[in-house]
Design a protein with these regions (language model features):
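Active-site environment of divalent metal-dependent phosphoester hydrolases
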Residues: 56-58, 91-95, 114-116, 153-156, ...
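Divalent metal-coordination and catalytic microenvironments
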Residues: 25, 41, 49-52, 81, ...
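Acidic/histidine-rich helix-loop elements
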Residues: 55-67, 116-126, 156-163, 238, ...
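Histidine/acidic-residue-rich catalytic or RNA/ligand-binding cores of hydrolases
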Residues: 59-62, 194-200, 232-245, 261-263, ...
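Metal-associated gating/positioning segment near the N- to mid-region
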Residues: 42-101, 117-122, 200
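His/Asp/Glu-enriched, well-ordered alpha-helical/loop segment
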Residues: 179, 258-338
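N-terminal metal-binding scaffold of metallo-dependent hydrolase/deaminase domains
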Residues: 1-33, 43-44, 337-342, 357-358
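Histidine/acidic residue-rich metal-binding segments in metalloenzymes
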Residues: 33, 130-226, 242-243, 255-275, ...
Length: 360
C-alpha cells in the first residue's frame, strides 16, 4: 500500500485545472483525507512514453550482461519523465526489472527477428523465411503483445538496402502473431520492403524513411502507425559515410532517405497516420532523450500539441496504458510551465509519480 498523495494543476490533455488525489497507487478525483500535497500548480502530464527503445543493448550494439547497467538505462529514461517504454527488441531478458516498482513500465517485443546475416550481429534471432512463422509465435509468447521484424537491411551481395522476407511469408507471419494476440512492427529504412509489410497487415512501421505518397495513403487507410525515430535518423549521414567505399549505392540511398525524412513524417501526419515518439535509445543512442524526439517531430511539421501527444497521452492509449483518470494507476509528470507552449519544458520535470509513488 502506498501513502495517499494530493496534486493540483492543469491536467492534460483536457487542459482543466483540477485537484487530483492518489489512493492505493491510483488516481481519484475524490478528496482523500490526510493526503500529502506533493505538488501544487503547474501542468500535469500523463507519464511520457518512449515508443521505441532497446533496454539491454549497450554501446556498439552489444548485449549488456550487467544488471545494474541495464537498470541504469531504465533510470535514465525515468529521469527524463519517461514512465513507460516500448522495447522494440532486445537480446537480454529484462523481466527482472518488472520486480522494481520504481522503474518504468516496459512493453516488450521479445527479440528482433531477421534473416541470416541481415542485421547487427548477435542481436536478432536469425531464421530462414521458412521458419519465420514459428519464430514469430515464439517471440509473441515472450513479449508483451508485440513482435519485431527486421524488414530491410543492407544486402551485401547487392550493395544496398533490400527486403528480407517474401510477401507470402510476411502475410503468414503477421497472421500468426495476431493469432497469438500480438501486434507486429518492423524496422524499415528503405521503400522496397514496405508494400509487402503493409499488404501483410502489419500494425506499425519503425523509422519509415522510405515511405512514399501512395504508401502513406495505404497506412492511413489501414490505421498502420509509424514511429519515425528522428533522433536516430540524424545518424544516416554517418552510416552513409561509413559505407561509402564498399557500398556506394547504399551510401547514396541513406543520404536520400535522410534528406526526405522530415517531409515523410509531415506527410504521414497530415494524411492521418498515427505517429508516435520513439528515440531508438540503446546501442548508439543514449536513453533519456525523449525531449529531443518530441522537438524533432515538431520541427518536421507536427503541431506542438500533436508532438507532445505522440510521447504522452496518445502513445499511452496506443499501448493500452491509462492516463490521468479515475482508478488509473498513478503515473504523472508535473511541469512548471505548459509543455504545449514550450516543448523544451519537457527537459525540466518538477515532480514525477510512478505507480503512485514519488520518484522525482
Amino acid at each position: 500500500m502506498t501513502a495517499p498523495l494530493h496534486l493540483s494543476g492543469v491536467v492534460l490533455p483536457e487542459a482543466e485545472h483540477r485537484d487530483v488525489w492518489v489512493r492505493d497507487g491510483r488516481f481519484t478525483f475524490e478528496r482523500v483525507p490526510g493526503a500529502e500535497t506533493v505538488s501544487r500548480g503547474g501542468w500535469l502530464l500523463p507519464g511520457l512514453v518512449d515508443a521505441h527503445c532497446h533496454v539491454g543493448i549497450g554501446a556498439g550494439g552489444t548485449a549488456i550482461e550487467d544488471r545494474d547497467a541495464t537498470r541504469q538505462q531504465a533510470l535514465d529514461e525515468r529521469a527524463a519523465g519517461v514512465l513507460a517504454l516500448r522495447d522494440c527488441g532486445s537480446p537480454v531478458d529484462t523481466r527482472f526489472l518488472d520486480d522494481e516498482p520504481d522503474l518504468p513500465h516496459i512493453v516488450r517485443a521479445g527479440r528482433h527477428i531477421a534473416a541470416p546475416r541481415r542485421y547487427i550481429p548477435d542481436l536478432a534471432v536469425e531464421v530462414e523465411p521458412a521458419d519465420l512463422v514459428a519464430a514469430v509465435r515464439v517471440q509473441a509468447r515472450r513479449g508483451d503483445g508485440w513482435v519485431k521484424l527486421v524488414g530491410d537491411w543492407i544486402d551485401r551481395t547487392q550493395g544496398d538496402l533490400s527486403p528480407e522476407w517474401p510477401a507470402d511469408v510476411l502475410a503468414a507471419a503477421v497472421a500468426a502473431a495476431h493469432e497469438e494476440g500480438a501486434r507486429v512492427t518492423a524496422h524499415t529504412f528503405g521503400t522496397d520492403a514496405l508494400p509487402g509489410l503493409l499488404g501483410a497487415g502489419i500494425d506499425c512501421i519503425e523509422h519509415g524513411t522510405g515511405l512514399t505518397e501512395d504508401l502513406v495513403a495505404e497506412m492511413a487507410a489501414r490505421g498502420t502507425a509509424v514511429v519515425p525515430t528522428l533522433v536516430n535518423v540524424e545518424n544516416f549521414p554517418g552510416f552513409a559515410a561509413a559505407g561509402e567505399k564498399r557500398f556506394p549505392a547504399y551510401a547514396s540511398t541513406m543520404r536520400r532517405l535522410y534528406a526526405q525524412s522530415g517531409a515523410v513524417v509531415r506527410a504521414a501526419f497530415e494524411a492521418g497516420v498515427p505517429v508516435y515518439a520513439g528515440t531508438d535509445a540503446g546501442g548508439g543512442i543514449e536513453h533519456g532523450v525523449i525531449a529531443d524526439e518530441v522537438r524533432a517531430l515538431h520541427t518536421a511539421g507536427l503541431p506542438a500539441e500533436a508532438a507532445l501527444a505522440a510521447a504522452s497521452w496518445a502513445a499511452r492509449d496506443w499501448l493500452g496504458l491509462p492516463c490521468i483518470e479515475e482508478g488509473a494507476l498513478a503515473d504523472v509528470v508535473v511541469y512548471d510551465t505548459d509543455p504545449r507552449a514550450d516543448l523544451d519544458t519537457l527537459r525540466r520535470p518538477r515532480r514525477m509519480i510512478l505507480r503512485g509513488v514519488v520518484v522525482g
